[in-house]
Amino acid sequence: MAAAVAAALARLLAAFLLLAAQVACEYGMVHVVSQAGGPEGKDYCILYNPQWAHLPHDLSKASFLQLRNWTASLLCSAADLPARGFSNQIPLVARGNCTFYEKVRLAQGSGARGLLIVSRERLVPPGGNKTQYDEIGIPVALLSYKDMLDIFTRFGRTVRAALYAPKEPVLDYNMVIIFIMAVGTVAIGGYWAGSRDVKKRYMKHKRDDGPEKQEDEAVDVTPVMTCVFVVMCCSMLVLLYYFYDLLVYVVIGIFCLASATGLYSCLAPCVRRLPFGKCRIPNNSLPYFHKRPQARMLLLALFCVAVSVVWGVFRNEDQWAWVLQDALGIAFCLYMLKTIRLPTFKACTLLLLVLFLYDIFFVFITPFLTKSGSSIMVEVATGPSDSATREKLPMVLKVPRLNSSPLALCDRPFSLLGFGDILVPGLLVAYCHRFDIQVQSSRVYFVACTIAYGVGLLVTFVALALMQRGQPALLYLVPCTLVTSCAVALWRRELGVFWTGSGFAKVLPPSPWAPAPADGPQPPKDSATPLSPQPPSEEPATSPWPAEQSPKSRTSEEMGAGAPMREPGSPAESEGRDQAQPSPVTQPGASA
C-alpha cells in the first residue's frame, strides 16, 4: 500500500515537473537604432519562446545585427530565400502558410542570427516540439505589424537591432496592494457574515419599518449544492475555453449585474444611517416601486447601477478602469460572503477540498489533455492567445505593475487574483466567526483562520516568484486555512461540535441587536381576561406557538418573578420579556 502511494506521488511530482518545464512564451525587447545615425534607439515588444534559444538579459551583452525587411515573403520554402541568404542578419518575415519551425529552419540554414515574424494579429507563442527545439539554435520571436511600420518609418530602411529579454523584479509592489485587498475582504466579509447571521437569529421576528430594510436571507450550502456547483464550474470553464469570444460577454454582463447588487448591499447600511432622504415615493402600481422605497435608497440603487455601467463601457481603459473593477469586485465578494453560508465545518471541508482538486486539475493536468499543451485555467483567466475580442474576464482583482521595467511596453501590466481565491476561503472564515460567537470563544477561530489565509497568500506569492508563472492560489490557501481551523478545534477540544456545527445550539447571552419590545410577534391573548401561567395542557388550540415552546408554559421566574400579566405590547409585559431568557424559537439552533 505504501509503495503504491509513493508511486502515485512520484507520478504527480513528475507531472508537476514536466509542466514546470513547459515554458510557453516570454516577453522580450528588440532595440532598434539607425545604421546611418540619427534618432536615439527605441525598444519594441516581442514575444519569444526560450526553448528555441535564450536571449541575453542585458542590452550590453546583445549583438547588434542588420535588420532586414523580408516581409514580402512568407519564408515557407527555399524559393523564398534571397540569393545571398541572411548571413549575420535578423530577417523580418510575414506570418502564415507554414509552421514556425519551417520558417526558422530556413532562416538558420541561410545564415540568419535570429528571426522576427511579423504578425497582423495578436501575438502568439512561436511553438514547436522537443526535436525541433534541439535542432534550432537561433532565437525566434513575433513582432506586431504596427511596430514593424514604426521601425522603418522612424529609422529608415537601414537599421540595426539587438534582441534581449530584461529581467523583471521577482515581486512587484502591487502584490502588497493585492494582499491588503484580499485579506481585508476576507476579514471584513467573514466578520460581517458572522455578525449578521447571529443578528438575524436574534431578530428573526422583527418587523422592518420599510420594505427596503429587508435583508437578503442567507443560503445554506448543502453537499448536493456543492457537487452541482463544481459541475457547473467545470462545464463553464470548458465552454469558455472553446467558446471564449461568445461567452466572455455573458460573463461581463453577469458581473455588471452582480457587482451593482453587491455594491448596493454594502452601501445600504451606511445610507440608512443618514438623517435625510427618508421620504418615500408616491403610491404607484409599478413593479418594485409599488412598495414605495425611500428616496435615498432609490438614489443609491441608481448610483450603483451607474458605477457598474461606467465600468462596463470603459472596462478596457487600463489607466483607471481597474480601480472600478476592484471596487465592484470587493463589493461583490462581500455580498457573496454574507449571503452564502456553510452550516458546518464538514460542509466547509467538502467545498474547499473539491475546489482544491478542481484548481489543481485545470491548472496542472489539463496541459496534458489539450492539443496546444496549455492550461485551461490559465488560458481562460488571462484570455486565449487567439481571441479575436481581446476581452478579459472581470472576475479578478487586478493591479498594474508598479516597478518600472522596459517590459511595461508589452501587454502584461497587471497582476491578478481571482475572486474564487477570496470567496472559497472566506466562507470558512465566516463559519469560524459564527462559531466563535456561538461558543463565546473570543473569536479565536476567526482570527486564526484569517491569519492562516494571509500566510497562505504569502506562500502563493513566494511560489509565483520562484516559478515565474501563474499559480493556483487554492493549492496553498486551502491547506493553510483548513489545517489551522482544525488545529484550533483540537487544541480547544471542540472538534466534534466544530465539525457538526452543534455549538450553535448553545444558549446565548442577550444580544445588543435584540428587537424592540413591542415589535416581536405575540401569541394571541384574550384582552378581556388577565393572563396567568398555565400548564401546557391548557394551551389554546389556536396558538401559533408549539406546545413545548409556548410562552404560557413558562414559569413565573422566566416571565419575570411576580410580574402581573398584561395585554400584548403593554410596557409591563415587554419588560418581563426582556428579562427572560431567549425563547427556543429565536435561538440559533434549529437551522445551524
UniProtKB/Swiss-Prot annotation:
Top-level taxon of the source organism: Eukaryota
Known EC number: 3.4.23.-
Keywords from the named record: Cell membrane, Endosome, Glycoprotein, Golgi apparatus, Hydrolase, Lysosome, Membrane, Protease, Signal, Transmembrane, Transmembrane helix
EC class: hydrolase
Pfam families xrefs: PA, Peptidase_A22B
Notes concerning its domains: The PAL motif is required for normal active site conformation. The catalytic domains embedded in the membrane are in the opposite orientation to that of the presenilin protein family; therefore, it is predicted to cleave type II-oriented substrate peptides like the prototypic protease SPP.
Protein location: Cell membrane; Golgi apparatus membrane; Lysosome membrane; Endosome membrane
Residue spans of biased composition, Polar residues class: 580-592
Molecular function terms, GO-annotated: aspartic endopeptidase activity, intramembrane cleaving; protein homodimerization activity
Outcome recorded upon mutating D421A: Loss of intramembrane-cleaving activity toward ITM2B, TNF and the simian foamy virus envelope glycoprotein gp130
Positions of glycan attachment: N97, N129
Residues spanning the signal sequence: 1-25
Tissue expression profile of the protein: Expressed predominantly in adrenal cortex and mammary gland.
Assigned protein family: Belongs to the peptidase A22B family.
Intervals, Lumenal compartment: 26-174, 245-248, 315-319, 370-412, 467-470
Cytoplasmic side: 196-221, 272-293, 341-348, 434-445, 492-592
Statement: the UniProt record of this protein carries the keyword Translocase: no
Motif (PAL): 472-474
Annotated protein name in UniProt: Signal peptide peptidase-like 2B
Organism: Homo sapiens
Membrane topology according to the record: Multi-pass membrane protein
